[in-house]
Amino acid sequence: MDPDFWHERWRQKQTGFHQTQVNPLLETFWPRCVGPARPRVFVPLCGKSLDMVWLRNRGHSVLGNELSPIAVDEFFRENGLSAVTTPLGNGFVRAESGDISLLCGNYFDLTPDLIGKVGAIYDRAALVAMPPEMQGRYAEQVFRLLPETPPMLLITLEYDAEEMSGPPFPVPEEAVVRLFGPAYRIELLSARDALEGNPQLRAKGLSRLTEKAYWLRAQASA
């Protein structure tokens, strides 16, 4: 997607993709999958997600990446957090408050040195924000940034693409396997009907919407 598209969505407050509550799949499956460990978590295309506050409250250090400075500013302001901002060059600004740090800039311009060491990935809104022709590039960037392939909780949507043009875009299970299967063991945790909770998508003509959660773990070395 063109960056200007997302900048305009935030300027016009067309942010129906923002969830006003913590994602229930995160609440259900993160403790079960991660256990007592408290790894540093990378949240790509994080927006102003409350999920990051939930992760922080569980003892994680959180690193988010977001294109829109409006989203970054609103995240800290709406959660009563005072952030320190630092220009990093290459078009990035870091905004930091305690254990939450957001890198404001284009995901595809991120470099491993900006990310640092990460112990887990949480993707609720990144892959589904990419049209199918960009999803491979998104996954390649994950591997480039984090070659150690930390575990990932991935949440996707499935629907008939003929009924609606995204975003959000459908990511069928076979696409998850194609994109991440070479490096990860993929476990389907949940598949639930999500149409009732997304009236704005029903209004666009969707007759079916399935939200799926996957737990991805690195393939065992030969």
Swiss-Prot record:
Keyword Cytoplasm attributed: yes
Family annotation (Pfam families): TPMT (PF05724)
Binding site for S-adenosyl-L-methionine: W10, L45, E66, R124
Single GO molecular function: thiopurine S-methyltransferase activity
Keyword S-adenosyl-L-methionine in annotation: yes
Any one GO cellular component localisation term in the record: cytoplasm
EC identifiers of the protein: 2.1.1.67
Protein localization: Cytoplasm
One of the GO BP terms on file: response to metal ion
Keywords noted in UniProt: Cytoplasm, Methyltransferase, S-adenosyl-L-methionine, Transferase
InterPro entries hit by this protein: SAM-dependent_MTases_sf, Thiopur_S-MeTfrase_Se/Te_detox, Thiopurine_S-MeTrfase, TPMT
Classification via NCBIfam families: PRK13255.1 (NF009732), TMPT_Se_Te (TIGR03840)
Family that this chain belongs to: Belongs to the class I-like SAM-binding methyltransferase superfamily. TPMT family.
The name this protein goes by in its record: Thiopurine S-methyltransferase
Native source species: Methylococcus capsulatus (strain ATCC 33009 / NCIMB 11132 / Bath)
